[in-house]
Amino acid sequence: MSIPTPYEDLLRDVLANGTHKSDRTGTGTLSVFGRQMRFDLSQSFPLITTKRVHFKSVAVELLWFLRGETNVKWMQDQGVTIWNEWADADGELGPVYGVQWRSWPTPDGGHIDQIAELVENLKSNPDSRRHIVSAWNVAELQDMALPPCHAFFQFYVADGKLSCQLYQRSADTFLGVPFNIASYALLTCMLAQQVGLEPGEFVWTGGDVHIYDNHMDQVLKQLKREPYEYPQLKILRKPDSIFDYTLDDFEVVGYQHHPTIKAPIAV
């Protein structure tokens, strides 16, 4: 039985069908528009195996989002520096993901905690079609160090399982997408535990799906590697709320992977 390779198939798709485009960073990309991948979270945890994905960074960043943070210091204190290139001299990023998830401003001066409302609505009205969180706040885009790439996500409950679909407007397929897959898969598993459901599917939908010109050699190297089975995720305790998880609550079991492949970040 062959191992499913939706991510590697996406890389091949971009290489085969992409159009050369200029981009904001001046790097240049090979790009396709409108692609989708599906991952069955009831069977495994989709941590890409054809190169190493640093799970600690994935988890710390997600916990940082859930804290509603805008400064990189908390992540740096955990040994994670993935946002440093976009922060100002004080470590600030503006009203990025955490603010929009936890404290979306309202016209009357109040704030909406989208994550808290999501959890409550999943419990009280699981069949709703409004289990949505948006980070794309048009009124505050100009104040963000980087407008949201993974901008909008929706949850769906059926047969005792919680599924998630993410819309990612801009997808750095080599560096960013493996991280994003793992992050939203982890969030789905955490939410499922909190609301008494089992993990279902994670559906990744991409808008501008691209490989940067200076990542081509790395992608070709990665695609020569044989994939391994995905690992399993264990959540070691159930905290009082979605906001009370720590890094020590997560264990990835059986993660067999090829070595890291380094590549420059387009800032």
Curated annotation (Swiss-Prot):
Pathway connected to this protein: Pyrimidine metabolism; dTTP biosynthesis
Pfam families named among the record's database cross-references: Thymidylat_synt
GO MF assignments: thymidylate synthase activity
InterPro entries per UniProt: Thymidate_synth/dCMP_Mease, Thymidate_synth/dCMP_Mease_dom, Thymidate_synth/dCMP_Mease_sf, Thymidylate_synthase, Thymidylate_synthase_AS
First-level EC class: transferase
Keyword Methyltransferase set for record: yes
SUPFAM superfamilies in the record: Thymidylate synthase/dCMP hydroxymethylase (SSF55831)
GO cellular component term of the entry, any: cytosol
Subcellular location: Cytoplasm
Residues the record marks as active site: 149 (nucleophile)
Binding site for (6R)-5,10-methylene-5,6,7,8-tetrahydrofolate: 54, 172, 266
Superkingdom as given in the UniProt entry: Bacteria
Annotated binding of dUMP, by residue: 24, 129-130, 169-172, 180, 210-212
Primary location group: cytoplasm
Chemical reaction(s) catalysed: dUMP + (6R)-5,10-methylene-5,6,7,8-tetrahydrofolate = 7,8-dihydrofolate + dTMP
Quaternary state and interactors: Homodimer.
Protein task: Catalyzes the reductive methylation of 2'-deoxyuridine-5'-monophosphate (dUMP) to 2'-deoxythymidine-5'-monophosphate (dTMP) while utilizing 5,10-methylenetetrahydrofolate (mTHF) as the methyl donor and reductant in the reaction, yielding dihydrofolate (DHF) as a by-product. This enzymatic reaction provides an intracellular de novo source of dTMP, an essential precursor for DNA biosynthesis.
UniProt family annotation: Belongs to the thymidylate synthase family. Bacterial-type ThyA subfamily.
Name of this chain's protein: Thymidylate synthase
